[in-house]
């Protein structure tokens, strides 16, 4: 496994974000995947990081117990012995499930992650090699700038916003130390979204560069009086086809790596939104409650974290699908009709694009796209309506009991 800077410009650019994610126990440090690290030092680093992950997991279990105790005290205080208890306990349990899943994923899929890094580095070099005969320059944004604006900025927002949104939400039964540790855990959970988006953007950059080579090839076929270079251009077309096939397989590996962690993140964020709405309704009768705006911010934040994941995946798929349009444009050129070798190569490439549909999935459990996010919003709105109906009935019953006790 290699992640040397000389091998891959993409992985070198992504390294700082991977380091931050490793601090929160989400992914192994990038140094573990370098051949320059001596075996003894690698073993010491891995042993130390394993102990660090165990400490994080123990902290999560401890805070799970503290949060459950605080939840029961809040439920007893507001007399809401209904589904609020079940929903709250399930939401707290999902935190433990996600943290445990992350640690097991690092342990069981360590080799798969190394292969993913290797394939990204090899694809990076392969695309550079296939484009060396073209003099045109790409006009897309700098990859470093794209990561800074999309991943870096969002990670800073997550780390900065979560403590403000959760401040004082746990009530008077929660010690400030537990609150700080809980905030760290919540940051860790939500950073799983940017981690996934980082890999999506790596794939996106590979597709952009592969498409750019194809566009340059099209320009050469338009301007060049084909003859001597037609065989060279056909070889470039075949290389481009093979690279796209490898990118498709890479996306499949990434989906398998993030299968359970992303599934649990979607489930946790959806359930937490319902949990926040439920407590917003319960606390609405408390004149001293000052956290309603924070609850609205939490709902928006949790939704937006999932939206970004779906949005980047959708953009990547659309860019991949645009390659078929470029192939059809090349097929319409007079050169494609003139040279049988080029015509057959285009036909094979187009058939491959028709069969290898790019989909970002959680290991085949569901597709990550804007359609998923829209369906999730509709489902949540339906559950919110049900919660509101139940709470209206509860408030009416409480009011009736109070009136009865006052008259008696």
Curated annotation (Swiss-Prot):
Residues 1-42, 114-146, 205-261, 318-367 are cytoplasmic. GO terms for cellular component: axon; dendrite; membrane; neuronal cell body; plasma membrane. Its main location: membrane. GO terms for molecular function: ligand-gated monoatomic ion channel activity. One of its GO terms (biological process) is sensory perception of taste. Residues 64-92, 168-183, 283-296, 389-408 are extracellular. Glycans are attached at residue 403. Pfam families: 7tm_7. InterPro entries: 7TM_chemorcpt (IPR013604). It is found in: Cell membrane. The chain crosses the membrane at residues 43-63, 93-113, 147-167, 184-204, 262-282, 297-317, 368-388. Keywords: Cell membrane, Glycoprotein, Membrane, Receptor, Transducer, Transmembrane, Transmembrane helix. It is a multi-pass membrane protein. PANTHER family: GUSTATORY AND ODORANT RECEPTOR 63A-RELATED, INVERTEBRATE GUSTATORY RECEPTOR. Probable gustatory receptor which mediates acceptance or avoidance behavior, depending on its substrates. Belongs to the insect chemoreceptor superfamily. Gustatory receptor (GR) family. Gr2a subfamily. This is Putative gustatory receptor 98c. The lineage of its organism: Eukaryota, Metazoa, Ecdysozoa, Arthropoda, Hexapoda. The gene is Gr98c.
């Amino acid at each position: 496994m290699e992640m040397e800077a000389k091998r891959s410009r993409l992985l070198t650019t992504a390294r700082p974000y991977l380091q931050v994610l490793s601090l929160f126990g989400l992914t192994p440090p990038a140094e573990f995947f370098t051949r320059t690290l001596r075996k003894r030092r690698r073993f010491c680093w891995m042993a130390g990081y394993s102990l660090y992950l165990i400490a994080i997991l123990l902290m999560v279990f401890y805070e799970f117990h503290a949060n459950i105790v605080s939840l029961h005290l809040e439920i007893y205080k507001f007399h809401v012995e209904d589904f609020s208890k079940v929903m709250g306990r399930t939401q707290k349990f999902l935190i433990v499930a996600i943290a445990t899943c992350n640690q097991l994923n690092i342990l069981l899929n360590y080799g798969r992650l190394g292969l993913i890094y290797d394939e990204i580095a090899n694809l990076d070099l392969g695309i550079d090699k296939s484009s060396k005969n073209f003099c045109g320059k790409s006009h897309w944004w700098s990859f470093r700038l794209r990561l800074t604006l999309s991943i870096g900025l969002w990670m800073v927002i997550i780390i900065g916003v979560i403590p403000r949104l959760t401040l004082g939400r746990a009530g008077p039964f929660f010690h400030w130390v537990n609150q700080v540790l809980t905030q760290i855990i919540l940051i860790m959970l939500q950073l799983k979204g940017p981690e996934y988006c980082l890999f999506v953007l790596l794939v996106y950059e590979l597709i952009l560069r592969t498409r750019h080579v194809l566009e340059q090839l099209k320009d050469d076929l338009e301007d060049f009086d084909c003859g001597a270079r037609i065989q060279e251009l056909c070889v470039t077309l075949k290389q481009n086809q093979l690279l796209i096939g490898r990118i498709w397989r890479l996306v499949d590996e990434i989906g398998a790596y993030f299968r359970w962690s992303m599934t649990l993140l979607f489930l946790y964020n959806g359930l937490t939104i319902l949990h926040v709405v439920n407590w917003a309704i319960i606390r609405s009768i408390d004149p001293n409650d000052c956290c309603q705006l924070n609850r609205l911010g939490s709902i928006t934040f949790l939704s937006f974290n999932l939206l970004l994941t779906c949005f980047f995946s959708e953009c990547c798929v659309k860019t991949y699908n645009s390659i078929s349009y470029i192939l059809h444009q090349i097929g319409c050129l007079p050169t494609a009709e003139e040279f049988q070798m080029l015509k057959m190569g285009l036909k094979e490439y187009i058939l491959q694009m028709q069969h290898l549909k790019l989909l970002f999935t959680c290991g085949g459990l569901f597709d990550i796209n804007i359609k998923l996010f829209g369906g999730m919003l509709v489902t949540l709105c339906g559950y919110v309506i049900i919660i509101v109906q139940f709470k209206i009935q509860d408030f009416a019953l409480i009011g009736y009991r109070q009136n009865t006790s006052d008259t008696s």
